[in-house]
A protein has these predicted regions:
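Short, aromatic-enriched amphipathic alpha-helices that serve as compact interaction elements
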Residues: 1-15
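Short glycine/proline-enriched coil/turn segments at helix->beta-strand junctions
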Residues: 2, 45, 85-87
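Hydrophobic pocket/interface hotspot
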Residues: 7, 19-20, 27, 46, ...
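Intrinsically disordered, low-complexity boundary segments flanking structured domains
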Residues: 14-17, 67-68
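A solvent-exposed, acidic/Ser-Thr-rich amphipathic alpha-helical stretch
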Residues: 25-68
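A beta-strand edge to alpha-helix "cap/lid" segment located at domain peripheries
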Residues: 55-112
């Protein structure tokens, strides 16, 4: 599986530890799709921040956020629908940078 496929798989499973392991030590996740559900943009720096935030997010949600309609445009770009609380949000995920050892350096999630 590509990194982006693994990311979506971890999100679907609600596995914050495996999700964090996809990121480099200082990897960045920038997710502005949360604004479509009335929340602040999520900007996380570092795999520990990713693990801690999604431990909280999955716990508060009662499990993973449903993801459907995934379409990979290319290896580093995917479109999908994600449900935050009661809001269905169409997003594009763009893996903009990967480290030499194959970890996510920067992943941007944007609402469409």
């Amino acid at each position: 599986m590509t990194l982006l496929e693994q990311y979506i798989d971890c999100m679907r499973k609600g596995d914050e530890c495996a999700l964090a392991d996809l990121f480099s030590k200082d990897g960045i996740l920038h997710d502005s799709s949360w604004t479509q559900a009335g929340e602040d943009t999520l900007h996380l720096s570092g795999k520990m921040a990713v693990e801690m935030m999604f431990h909280h997010k999955f716990g508060y949600n009662g499990g993973p956020f449903p993801i459907s309609g995934v379409k990979f445009m290319e290896e580093n770009v995917a479109w999908y629908f994600i449900v935050y609380h009661d809001s269905v949000v169409p997003v594009v995920a763009y893996l903009s940078s990967v480290t030499e050892d194959g970890k996510i350096d920067r992943l941007n999630i944007l609402p469409m």
